[in-house]
């Protein structure tokens, strides 16, 4: 299985613009699940959870009252787990920056 995400390169490493969609593609996967969390001084705050067959997508937006606003700038954590046809598990963890 191979893991591919639509990152843009920044000075700090992986990044993506606020409000865009983060797409995670994994080849030869039967089930894919993952989550995004914001890194904080006390640990992490869960933002989104997703599950799909071979492609996960996260819209980097959140609801504030009746409005939809993009995520705030900062460091976030992406954790992905995938199972293949033989039920073997593989996990990836990635830190990225919202700019």
Regions found by a protein language model. Give the residues of each.
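Short, compositionally biased P/S/T/A/G/V-rich stretches that sit at domain boundaries
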Residues: 1-23
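Short proline/glycine-enriched turn/loop motifs at strand-loop junctions of beta-rich domains
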Residues: 26-33
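Conserved aromatic beta-strand anchor motif in extracellular beta-sandwich/beta-rich domains
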Residues: 34-41
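A glycine-anchored, Pro-Gly-centered beta-turn/N-cap motif
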Residues: 52, 63, 72-76
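Signal that preferentially marks extracellular ectodomain short beta-strand elements
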Residues: 57-71
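Beta-strand-rich extracellular modules
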Residues: 81-85
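Extracellular and select intracellular beta-sandwich modules with Ser/Thr-enriched
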Residues: 88-94
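Interdomain boundary/hinge segments at the C-termini of tandem beta-sandwich modules
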Residues: 96-99
